[in-house]
Curated annotation (Swiss-Prot):
GO terms for cellular component: plasma membrane; proton-transporting ATP synthase complex. GO terms for molecular function: proton-transporting ATP synthase activity, rotational mechanism. Coiled coil: none annotated. It comes from Albidiferax ferrireducens (strain ATCC BAA-621 / DSM 15236 / T118). F-type ATPases have 2 components, F(1) - the catalytic core - and F(0) - the membrane proton channel. F(1) has five subunits: alpha(3), beta(3), gamma(1), delta(1), epsilon(1). F(0) has three main subunits: a(1), b(2) and c(10-14). The alpha and beta chains form an alternating ring which encloses part of the gamma chain. F(1) is attached to F(0) by a central stalk formed by the gamma and epsilon chains, while a peripheral stalk is formed by the delta and b chains. Belongs to the ATPase delta chain family. Transmembrane segments: none annotated. Gene3D superfamilies: N-terminal domain of the delta subunit of the F1F0-ATP synthase. It is found in: Cell inner membrane. InterPro entries: ATP_synth_OSCP/delta_N_sf, ATPase_OSCP/dsu. It is a peripheral membrane protein. This is ATP synthase subunit delta. Its main location: membrane. The lineage of its organism: Bacteria, Pseudomonadati, Pseudomonadota, Betaproteobacteria, Burkholderiales.
């Protein structure tokens, strides 16, 4: 993992510096490229020695939902030509960290057993921003195994109010 982070850092820094004028726009296409690059079949295709960098680029550009901006095209070509497609998710993660550091915000992942409607999510986001004393970029991921409640991860901080966590606490108390 440390090696992947070391490989990704110069790409993330260059991307951050090049996109300072439109960080939010860049974040959108970086996230899309990250999602595409996580596909194991795509990585297997890209690792095939009979496949050219141009073919990999055309495939990814075709998968992308919209036309990629010129900066995204150049960035993607560079990553593919240097054989670093597998590092793209880590590049995206480091880019997000730099973007958040500049804006003074953090990413928050809310794990929930059930879908959260937009009104409840907005209220939850406001409460979490007060609790963590900073602006949060909230995303939701469903985890039915939580049974009920939510688990929030902000950086290295975890706020777990799920039923599963409470059951685990009760189990620990009973077996202690």
């Amino acid at each position: 993992m440390a090696e992947l982070a070391t490989i990704a850092r110069p790409y993330a820094e260059a991307l951050f510096k090049a996109s300072l004028s439109d960080l939010n726009g860049a974040a959108v296409w970086v996230e899309e490229l990250e999602t595409i690059a996580k596909n194991p079949q795509l990585l297997q295709f890209a690792d095939n020695p009979n496949v050219t960098a141009a073919q990999v680029y055309e495939l990814i550009a075709g998968i992308a939902q919209g036309a990629l901006p010129a900066m995204a095209q150049n960035f993607l070509r560079t990553v593919i030509e240097n054989g670093r497609l597998s590092a793209l998710p880590e590049i995206a993660a480091q880019f997000r960290v730099m973007k958040n550091a500049q804006s003074g915000s953090s990413d928050a992942v809310v794990y929930s057993a059930f879908a959260i409607d937009s009104t409840a999510l907005a209220e939850l986001a406001a409460t979490l921003e007060q609790r963590f004393a900073r602006k949060l970029n909230v995303s939701v991921q469903l985890q039915p195994e939580l049974i009920g409640g939510i688990r929030v991860v902000v950086g290295d901080e975890v706020l777990d109010s799920s039923v599963k966590a409470r059951l685990e606490q009760m189990k620990m108390a009973l077996t202690a």
